Amino acid sequence: MAISQERKNELIKEYRTHEADTGSPEVQIAVLTAEITALNEHLREHKKDHHSRRGLLKMVGRRRHLLNYLRDKDVQRYRELIKSLGIRR
């Protein structure tokens, strides 16, 4: 269900804003998007896994809050991020 550490490190390298960046909104949103995608695949197979579904909804909410924060702070970075991640908003 969870993404591997290697995949997480790839996402951090791709979306970081500077060399030691692991906590910028872009990185957090990219990691959450990968986790949401993986959990979505799990839930397609295990339809009655309501515990994981609740976790998915919490992740989607956290990502939405981060996206709203980024949109309010820097619209250009926000637009580039949703385009590169393929998020509909």
From Swiss-Prot:
Name any one GO molecular function: structural constituent of ribosome
Instruction: Supply the gene name.
Output: rpsO
Cite a GO CC annotation: cytosolic small ribosomal subunit
Q: What InterPro entries would the database entry show?
A: Ribosomal_uS15, Ribosomal_uS15_bac-type, uS15_NS1_RNA-bd_sf
Q: What does this protein do?
A: One of the primary rRNA binding proteins, it binds directly to 16S rRNA where it helps nucleate assembly of the platform of the 30S subunit by binding and bridging several RNA helices of the 16S rRNA. Forms an intersubunit bridge (bridge B4) with the 23S rRNA of the 50S subunit in the ribosome.
Q: Which family does it belong to?
A: Belongs to the universal ribosomal protein uS15 family.
Q: Name one Pfam family in it.
A: Ribosomal_S15
Its assembly, as annotated, is: Part of the 30S ribosomal subunit. Forms a bridge to the 50S subunit in the 70S ribosome, contacting the 23S rRNA.
Which HAMAP family does this UniProt record tie to the protein?
Ribosomal_uS15_B (MF_01343_B)
What is the species listed in this Swiss-Prot or TrEMBL entry?
Staphylococcus saprophyticus subsp. saprophyticus (strain ATCC 15305 / DSM 20229 / NCIMB 8711 / NCTC 7292 / S-41)
Q: Which UniProt keywords apply?
A: Ribonucleoprotein, Ribosomal protein, RNA-binding, rRNA-binding
Q: Report the domain of life of the source organism.
A: Bacteria
* The protein's name in its UniProt record: Small ribosomal subunit protein uS15
Q: Name one GO biological process term.
A: translation
